[in-house]
């Protein structure tokens, strides 16, 4: 993993992200936007783990961030009814629209930043949520998921619904600079924020998988990954 930081101090990509080129490489194993490493194919087992949790209650699932369709494709293999997907980048959204025509379940593609789209969605509408967007500024690098979770995740879920999420760009940095125990990292940096959002500690659980990133991965080098399961009761 490169020692170069993903974001420079004060850097923000938010205003230019939507129409920046979606750089899928020739082998479709990497996605870069504005030079940022958004997603890589080696994440597949982990993305499938997140998708399995998000689909575990069936029904209507909200996915925030489409990327390379790794989690989305897994969700479509699960026993769900509807699949709502928010994506703000033009090129990625075009790929989402093409992908949607080939899927077995009802797909509802929603174009825009989640900050603009999510407030329009009704309360108690989803059985599952998978949040995996890319941070768009240095200021929100480690915290953007909490803006969604505290502002919207709890209200969007039906009672008994499930939330899962990740912020690999943040967690990769934390596991490189501050933590060598991934469960401790989650308990100290994530769980208190989830409780603040209305979820109860006893309804927050995690599973850990072994997964070795390639040496040239710029955002994650830790050899374990963590999948949260957060239930609204």
Swiss-Prot record:
EC number annotated for this UniProt entry: 2.1.1.2
Binding site for guanidinoacetate: 39, 43, 132, 168-169
Binding site for S-adenosyl-L-methionine: 17, 47, 66-71, 87-89, 114-115, 132
Annotated ranges, domain RMT2: 1-233
Pathway linked to the protein: Amine and polyamine biosynthesis; creatine biosynthesis; creatine from L-arginine and glycine: step 2/2
GO cellular component terms given for this protein: cytoplasm; nucleus
GO molecular function annotation: guanidinoacetate N-methyltransferase activity
GO biological process, one term: methylation
Organism superkingdom: Eukaryota
Keywords from the UniProt entry: Methyltransferase, S-adenosyl-L-methionine, Transferase
InterPro entries recorded: GuanidinoAc_N-MeTrfase, RMT2/GAMT_Mtase, RMT2_dom, SAM-dependent_MTases_sf
Stored CDD domains: AdoMet_MTases
Catalytic reaction list: guanidinoacetate + S-adenosyl-L-methionine = creatine + S-adenosyl-L-homocysteine + H(+)
Subunit architecture: Monomer.
Entry's family note: Belongs to the class I-like SAM-binding methyltransferase superfamily. RMT2 methyltransferase family.
Name of the protein in its database record: Guanidinoacetate N-methyltransferase B
UniProt organism field: Xenopus laevis (African clawed frog)
Gene giving rise to this polypeptide: gamt-b
